Amino acid sequence: RIEFDPDTTRGTKDRSWGIRPLAGGDQRGAPLPPARSSLFFLWAPLNFNDLCVHYQLFEDSLGRPLSSVGALLPAYDTLAELPDIEDPRARHMRAHEHRLQFDAGSRLAHTADLSFTAVDDGSRHEFHLERIFTFRMKGIGYHHPEWGHGAWKGDLAMASEKWDMETVDDQAFENQHCQHLMRATLGDRVGIGVLEQLCIGPYKPYGFDGFVGRSG
């Protein structure tokens, strides 16, 4: 059992994803043609003392939005405070924007300026993120070449791996999907959060013309 001090610990509860068709890819419907094999994805749950931020965006290779979700939400001190339905204080957002700064020679962001606009009154909200460290999502099965999600390995299979974070190949496909622990600022507020990113294939707004890497 691990005890967390609510005065020093912040967190975000993700929803249940249920059963996901990840092993072997989603075989439903016709496959996408190679020209559309690209994805730009950002997800940023951020925690401040008095509020939380939810920012999610999918865009195509030209930077056109495919899906976006955004909100400013109240922060809760205890589980007992969580509402059964949506809190009426939740403010929904639209018109997501982003400006990322990347590590040399890779697509991994070290800083990000994100913004969106409130649906209720049109006010624009901007927040700045600075990377503290990077977590490689292949460590929990995302795009791992051998131990991907849902891959059947028999009745009992066990393995372990170690990676030297100083020499990880940032050009490799399995290392593109990351979550960065970020120091976040929103006006006078300073908080903590995560920026999850995945950018594969061409992406015109940042000049990416290959499958991975800065220029492919």
Ranges and model annotations:
Residues 1-216:
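Structured soluble/peripheral alpha/beta segments that form catalytic or ligand/cofactor-binding pockets
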